[in-house]
């Protein structure tokens, strides 16, 4: 699909950057010669807009061997960022998709500045081409055919091999994020814990990874009482899924991802209202993020060791479901007083974290749609983060900044630990109250990470969007897929 050339050679459409400057860039000046100065006129009359995300279409009318030019407004160069570029290109690729363009090119060097080099631009372009044109996978009987871009050419004077490599990496990042989106959007009667495990096994086999899927009896033998408690009310069997990627000869410095895989959450006996229950098919967004990251890792083969662990079940009501006031024993041996059955994700993750450590994880990152509290605190754009190790957190933060997936650190103080340890009947309680809900959930998980360097990512606000946006339609976003993969790719770098 991707090609690199030094000159244009006939395309349906070409994308060109347009910055807000006193004069036209050299790229536009050269093209304007073929248009006999008409582009300058269009700029002066503001029919070619330089505003951020503005897309202006100009037909060549036979003046060049390209049918149409799409000028992408990027605003002032001093305010140009990777986020600006992602948003603008997302809109540009959507425009091409709507026009049913199958052969497009991009004047890559027109997007390059002192802040962003050609490698950065190529990576983002290929990534966003997938993200921006993602279509919801629906179950409608009348499905519309979608015309997809078949050929994309980067026009640049830079080294072709380096640009091709950047395009490939960006494409893989975008595709894997879309894989996660599709998982999150699937209805809960289709995506059960069993189906999620089957998907994970297929992924592992495709990329020659080791894997384990623990069944209920094996979980009982290992004492995974926290996950099993959440599963008590369900007719669907639970699964503890593990994918193991060995990128080094020695099994050292193992990065462990733990993704919450609650395929549907009614709240259990602490029942959600109808409004709060609709959409809970997405409560396995953490699992999807982890699997998306493993898809990227499988494709790009970084020299790192990585474990992905997914505790999976649904949380439903029945005569056998677990109840408030129950006391359960986790795999770690720590006992937990259940005060809220709707705080089930942290119970499943507790056993997932302990199991990841058992498999050899030296570093832990858990990802979960864990609390409504994080949405109240940070909104729908920023992922909440907590940690027991600032060095590991800084690496996660840098990866999130590189991928434009913002995170914000929330605290863990001793008094927070005291609240989750406050139980007359057990070592811990799973829900100390509404105050500081996001912090309480993360603090609870920290009790199981213990001394292992750990970062918690609460994607409850960022996993899905209610409306269409520059990088895709309403629904799942694939939050943290690219951040996790970038963390692995950059892990340990100074």
Curated annotation (Swiss-Prot):
The active site is at 272, 346. Coiled coil: none annotated. One of its GO terms (cellular component) is cytoplasm. GO terms for molecular function: manganese ion binding; metalloaminopeptidase activity. InterPro entries: Leucine_aapep/pepB, Macro_dom-like, Peptidase_M17_C, Peptidase_M17_leu_NH2_pept, Peptidase_M17_N. Mn(2+) 2 binds at residues 260, 265, 283, 344. Its main location: cytoplasm. Binds 2 manganese ions per subunit. Its EC number is 3.4.11.1, 3.4.11.10. Mn(2+) 1 binds at residues 265, 342, 344. It is found in: Cytoplasm. Keywords: Aminopeptidase, Cytoplasm, Hydrolase, Manganese, Metal-binding, Protease. Its cofactor is Mn(2+). It catalyses: Release of an N-terminal amino acid, Xaa-|-Yaa-, in which Xaa is preferably Leu, but may be other amino acids including Pro although not Arg or Lys, and Yaa may be Pro. Amino acid amides and methyl esters are also readily hydrolyzed, but rates on arylamides are exceedingly low; Release of an N-terminal amino acid, preferentially leucine, but not glutamic or aspartic acids. GO terms for biological process: proteolysis. Presumably involved in the processing and regular turnover of intracellular proteins. Catalyzes the removal of unsubstituted N-terminal amino acids from various peptides. Belongs to the peptidase M17 family. PANTHER family: CYTOSOL AMINOPEPTIDASE, LEUCINE AMINOPEPTIDASE-RELATED. HAMAP family: Cytosol_peptidase_M17. NCBIfam families: PRK00913.1-2, PRK00913.1-4, PRK00913.3-5. This is Probable cytosol aminopeptidase. It comes from Bacillus cereus (strain B4264). The gene is pepA.
């Amino acid at each position: 699909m991707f090609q690199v050339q030094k000159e244009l050679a006939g395309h349906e459409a070409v994308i060109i950057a347009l910055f807000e400057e006193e004069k036209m860039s050299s790229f536009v000046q050269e093209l304007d010669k073929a248009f006999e100065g008409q582009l300058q006129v269009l700029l002066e009359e503001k029919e070619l807009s330089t505003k951020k995300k503005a897309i202006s279409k100009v037909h060549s009318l036979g003046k060049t061997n390209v049918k149409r030019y799409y000028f992408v407004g990027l605003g002032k160069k001093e305010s140009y960022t990777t986020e600006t570029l992602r948003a603008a290109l997302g809109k540009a690729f959507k425009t091409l998709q709507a026009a049913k363009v199958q052969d497009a090119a991009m004047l890559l060097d027109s997007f390059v500045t002192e802040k962003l080099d050609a490698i950065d631009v190529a990576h983002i372009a290929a990534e966003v081409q997938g993200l921006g044109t993602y279509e919801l996978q629906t179950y409608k009987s009348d499905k519309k055919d979608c015309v997809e871009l078949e050929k994309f050419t980067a026009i640049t004077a830079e080294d072709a091999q380096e640009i091709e490599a950047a395009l490939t990496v960006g494409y893989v990042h975008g595709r894997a994020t879309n894989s996660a989106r599709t998982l999150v959007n699937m209805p809960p009667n289709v995506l059960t814990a069993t189906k999620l495990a089957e998907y994970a096994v297929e992924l592992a086999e495709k990329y020659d990874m080791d894997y384990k899927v623990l069944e209920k009896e094996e979980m009982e033998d290992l004492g995974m009482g926290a996950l099993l408690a959440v599963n008590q009310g369900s007719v669907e069997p639970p699964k503890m899924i593990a994918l193991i990627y060995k990128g080094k000869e020695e099994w050292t410095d193992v990065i462990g991802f733990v993704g919450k895989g609650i395929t549907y959450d009614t709240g259990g006996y602490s029942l959600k209202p109808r409004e709060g229950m609709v959409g809970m098919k997405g409560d396995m967004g953490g699992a999807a993020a982890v699997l998306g990251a493993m898809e990227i890792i499988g494709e790009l083969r970084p020299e790192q060791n990585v474990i992905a662990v997914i505790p999976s079940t649904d949380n439903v009501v029945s005569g056998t479901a677990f109840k408030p006031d129950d006391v359960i024993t986790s795999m770690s041996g720590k006992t937990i007083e259940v005060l809220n059955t709707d705080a089930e994700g942290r119970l499943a993750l507790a056993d997932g974290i302990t199991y990841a450590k058992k498999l050899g994880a030296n570093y832990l990152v858990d990802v979960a749609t864990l609390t409504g509290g994080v949405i109240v605190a940070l909104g729908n754009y920023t992922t909440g983060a907590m940690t027991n190790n600032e060095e590991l957190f800084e690496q996660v933060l840098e990866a999130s900044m590189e991928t434009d997936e913002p995170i914000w650190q929330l605290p863990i103080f001793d008094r927070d630990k005291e609240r989750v340890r406050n139980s007359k009947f057990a070592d811990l309680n799973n829900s100390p109250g509404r105050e500081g809900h996001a912090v309480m959930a993360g603090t609870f998980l920290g009790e199981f990470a213990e001394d292992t360097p750990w970062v918690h990512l609460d994607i409850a606000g960022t996993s899905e969007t209610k409306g269409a946006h520059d990088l895709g339609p309403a629904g799942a976003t694939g939050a943290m897929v690219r951040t996790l993969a970038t963390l692995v790719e950059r892990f340990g770098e100074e």
